């Protein structure tokens, strides 16, 4: 369908998992994909796979983020879509979570979204158009045991998404968030089968989502088909949050 034909799309954390699958989907729909990934090996491979452009990026570092956008503008001259996908986990219950664990997740999952969003919005305001898509999670709605830092970031992402939608709409910029539920990833595959089965039973459609389910949602929201949608949080969760 070429929903994203010719659009310059930056995907942070695009080297693996949902980010990688989203990069593949965007490329299939005609986008020129920029993989902004901290890990050089996975990032370069992803870019090669989708015929894209790899830029090693630490989303928690403002100088690295500034360099990302400078390189994209030098290469392409515009930014049409930013997918703020990069994120990490460092779980632990409240009394056992160390301060450095808390800070590390906040820096990547929340500050990183802010830095990349600011960089993209600055360019998009001058263009008069653009789309910013932020990765949240269904745990932002109901919390999750042992994830004080992670849940705080994903709830914060929803808040920022709504603020940015209000601030940037007049500049032709749409801002939305995706909140995935239980999605089959490498991280999930390492969990005990008993836990996997128990968690699957909590999903009304009785299956876990695939990365493609999330990628399809990102693609729709990035496209002109969603031109009147902004400030929305789309749950891709099989009905867990209703």
Model-derived segments and spans:
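C-terminal substrate-recognition "lid" of short-chain dehydrogenase/reductases
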Residues: 114, 129, 207-236, 241
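The beta1-alpha1 cofactor-binding region of Rossmann-like NAD(H)/NADP(H)-dependent oxidoreductases
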Residues: 40-41, 57-67, 99, 212-213
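Conserved glycine-rich cofactor-binding loop
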Residues: 8, 15-17
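Residue(s) in the substrate-gating loop at a strand-loop-helix junction
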Residues: 137
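Substrate-binding pocket helix/loop in short-chain dehydrogenase/reductase
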Residues: 93-94, 98-106, 188, 199
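Active-site helix of classical SDR
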Residues: 117, 153, 161
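Alpha-helical segment proximal to the catalytic Tyr-Lys
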Residues: 122, 166-170, 227
């Amino acid at each position: 369908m070429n929903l994203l034909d010719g659009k310059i799309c930056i995907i942070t954390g695009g080297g693996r998992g949902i980010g990688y699958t989203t990069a593949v989907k965007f490329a299939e729909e005609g986008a020129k994909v920029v993989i902004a990934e901290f890990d050089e090996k996975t990032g370069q491979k992803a870019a090669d796979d989708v015929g894209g452009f790899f830029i090693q990026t630490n989303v928690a570092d403002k100088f690295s983020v500034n360099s990302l956008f400078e390189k994209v503008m030098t290469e392409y001259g515009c930014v049409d879509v930013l997918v703020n996908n990069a994120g990490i986990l460092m779980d632990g219950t409240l009394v056992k979570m160390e301060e450095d664990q808390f800070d590390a997740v906040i820096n990547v999952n929340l500050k990183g979204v802010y830095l990349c969003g600011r960089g993209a919005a600055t360019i998009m305001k001058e263009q008069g158009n653009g789309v910013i898509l932020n990765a949240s999670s269904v745990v932002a709605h109901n919390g999750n045991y042992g994830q004080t830092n992670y849940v705080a970031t994903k709830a914060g992402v929803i808040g920022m998404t709504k603020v940015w939608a209000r601030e940037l709409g007049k500049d032709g910029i749409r801002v939305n968030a995706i909140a995935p539920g239980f999605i089959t990833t490498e991280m999930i595959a390492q969990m005990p089968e008993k836990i996997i089965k128990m968690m699957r039973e909590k999903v009304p459609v009785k299956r876990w989502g695939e990365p493609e389910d999330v990628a399809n949602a990102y693609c729709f929201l990035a496209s002109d088909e969603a031109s009147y949608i902004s400030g929305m949080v789309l749950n891709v969760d099989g009905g867990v949050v209703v």
